[in-house]
């Protein structure tokens, strides 16, 4: 990592802001649009601090390059849980002072970590275009059945959320996925299952791509983030979600070590953690709030379409953060080598 070129460092610093501005980096798309409405603009109105929003695709190498070279230009960063755990262990993120953020007891279990605060609960689900399929799939096993359901499949270009899906398609129960994946035989089994589908896969890297591929007909079904599909449904597109075998987790706010605006970053995270602001976020994208006090503020019909609804979460898989922190690097390397063949 430390051998990264100055060009990479320059690239990661391209989304900089003027002195005094707060740079917040997210995964973009409908998620960022919801954050702008719920957090960015209201925070600026409340504090006078301008929020400059940037985007990335989760490349921790960029964060490490900035921290190692002491050229940090990002103040607040949206990260997935495995990257939060690994980045915290490796000293890439600041430890958070919860006396300046809020009561840990107000958050759903697992959302208040030493280096990060949960923004929302999301799920990677099976989504399909109901205009293309007269009868929809019922789970990941059907995802692999290209005879019964002809057409391309969209899948995330990475080991995470893809190896789990492969095992469930091969008959592994949701509750046993990580137990199996923690063994060499389980990993081999997942890749063998992916081999079967590889000719029919169209890879996606950004969360905005699956709904685009589904609407255009490039794929007939895809793994996808539930909130992105829900937003496309709001636009009148006939996309459907299968919750069985969905993988749910948090995205969290973290502060890169050496942020030039640490105090303002903490104030922003505290602001974004308030129930009234999380309510606005969930109203704009179908992700569950991490502050439990936000749930009673939401319409009951909306709550039923969130990953946190009991009927949706009961057949899902909680993403095993410790597993991906321990094995993520080696599995991603193997996946990249496999995908390149």
What is the meaning of each model-derived region?
Residues 13-19:
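Sec/Tat signal peptide C-region and signal peptidase I cleavage site
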Residues 29-36, 72-74, 78-211, 215:
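Extracytoplasmic ligand-binding site segments that recognize negatively charged/polar headgroups
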Residues 84-86, 221-238:
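A ligand-binding cleft/hinge motif common to bilobed small-molecule-binding domains
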Residues 20-87:
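Early extracytoplasmic/lumenal segment of secretory-pathway proteins
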Residues 256-316:
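Mature extracytoplasmic/periplasmic domains
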């Amino acid at each position: 990592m430390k051998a990264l070129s100055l060009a990479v460092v320059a690239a990661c610093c391209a989304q900089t802001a003027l002195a005094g501005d707060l740079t917040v980096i997210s995964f973009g798309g409908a998620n960022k649009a919801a954050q702008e409405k719920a957090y960015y603009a209201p925070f600026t109105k409340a504090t006078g601090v301008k929020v400059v929003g940037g985007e990335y695709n989760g490349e921790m190498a960029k964060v490490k390059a900035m921290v190692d070279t002491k050229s940090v230009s990002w103040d607040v960063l949206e990260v997935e849980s495995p990257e939060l755990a690994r980045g915290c262990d490796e000293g890439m993120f600041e430890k958070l002072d919860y006396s300046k953020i809020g009561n840990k007891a107000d958050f759903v279990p697992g959302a208040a970590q030493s280096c990060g605060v949960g923004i929302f609960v999301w799920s990677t689900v099976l989504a399909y275009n109901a205009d293309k399929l007269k009868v929809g799939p019922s789970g990941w096993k059907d995802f692999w059945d290209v005879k019964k359901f002809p057409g391309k499949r969209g899948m995330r270009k990475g080991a995470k959320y893809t190896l789990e899906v492969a095992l469930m398609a091969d008959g592994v129960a949701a509750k046993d996925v990580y137990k199996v994946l923690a063994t060499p035989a389980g990993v081999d089994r997942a890749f063998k299952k992916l081999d079967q589908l590889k000719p029919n896969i169209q890879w996606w890297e950004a969360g905005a791509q699956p709904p685009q591929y589904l609407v255009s007909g490039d794929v007939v079904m895809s793994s996808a983030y539930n909130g992105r599909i829900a937003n496309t449904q709001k636009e009148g597109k006939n996309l459907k979600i299968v919750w069985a075998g969905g993988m749910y987790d948090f995205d969290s706010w973290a502060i890169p070590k050496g942020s030039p605006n640490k105090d303002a970053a903490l104030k922003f995270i505290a602001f974004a953690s308030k129930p009234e602001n999380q309510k606005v976020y969930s109203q704009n994208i179908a992700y569950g709030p991490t502050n439990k006090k936000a749930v009673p503020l939401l319409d009951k019909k909306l709550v039923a379409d969130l990953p946190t609804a009991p009927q949706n979460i009961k057949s899902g898989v909680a993403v095993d953060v410790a597993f991906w922190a321990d094995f993520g690097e080696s599995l991603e390397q193997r996946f990249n080598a496999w995908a390149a063949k």
